[in-house]
Amino acid sequence: MINSNNQVLSEIRFDWNKKEILEILNMPLIDLMWESQIVHRKFNSYNIQLASLFSVKTGGCEENCSYCSQSIYSASEIKSHPQFQVEEVLARAKIAKNEGADRFCMGWAWREIRDGKSFNAMLEMVSGVRDLGMEACVTAGMLTEEQASRLADAGLTAYNHNLDTSPEHYKNIITTRTYQDRLDTIKRVRNAGINVCCGGIIGLGETNGDRASLLEVLSNMNPHPESVPINSLVAIEGTGLEDNQEIDSIEMIRMIATARILMPKSKIRLSAGREKLSKEAQILCFQCGANSIFYGDELLTTSNPSFQSDRKLLKEVGVSFNKDFETCEKTLSSL
């Protein structure tokens, strides 16, 4: 909550309302940054989790998400790829581990998981990643209770299923899946004992109120999502949002800081669109509460800062991270 002096009281809550969140989101930036740092220092160390993201199956998704080049409704020219073999994925995971990745995230461009050979291969991949001593995360659309249970049995650490935007703005972004579908998927994941990875995207044409509404839904989940990816739109030619303007970096800093205040213990992951942020803006995001990044030259179908530039940045900032990332020279992009 906010006291009479406009200070945020650092406590873990699950009953934030939109009015309170807007007050935080709209605080003078210097005050917002100060308050978020207080919360971040109380609940977390300045340790950055390094996550590697690999597209196991690219393109051909049946959903019509207007920001996504992997949708069958998109006119984007992307290089589609059928599902990689288990051995190929685990070889990538092993390289990621040697590079210092703490978590290996695997993405499938699917509307939903379907039982059969592909799902069985996914289970093998999850088990294989865990056998390497890494956290395993999957993002593959909707799933059933039984599928969630089987993923849990395979050792899945986290399942990513983003809300994208507010309930009010959602219908302007996607119509092939409802907001409730997303919430139901998250519930099944949680009921199976798998950590929830859930966040959103800014720059979709939403208002500040929409951003507060998205954060309200996330911060009222009990427990809070284990990790919260905050993405900024990467406008891709051929998608429905190709003409959207880039967001100002201050908007990302505000979103990161507010998310940290609302969800003190969650990993706040600075995700897609990070390449557009200056070094200084990224440093402010880390200062305000971001404590996880995706590293590697590409995130599914969008670009990302280079391995070398990230390593240099983290060393300059003075945060702690896996030391293998500091010494390894080989990168996934070199394969």
From Swiss-Prot:
Residue ranges the record marks as coiled coil: none
Known catalytic reactions: (4R,5S)-dethiobiotin + (sulfur carrier)-SH + 2 reduced [2Fe-2S]-[ferredoxin] + 2 S-adenosyl-L-methionine = (sulfur carrier)-H + biotin + 2 5'-deoxyadenosine + 2 L-methionine + 2 oxidized [2Fe-2S]-[ferredoxin]
Listed InterPro entries: Aldolase_TIM, BATS_dom, Biotin_synth/BioAB, Biotin_synthase, Elp3/MiaA/NifB-like_rSAM, rSAM
Residues annotated as signal peptide: none
Keyword annotations of the record: 2Fe-2S, 4Fe-4S, Biotin biosynthesis, Iron, Iron-sulfur, Metal-binding, S-adenosyl-L-methionine, Transferase
Enzyme Commission designation: 2.8.1.6
Matching NCBIfam families: bioB
Family per similarity comment: Belongs to the radical SAM superfamily. Biotin synthase family.
Designated name of the protein: Biotin synthase
Natural source organism: Prochlorococcus marinus (strain AS9601)
Gene: bioB
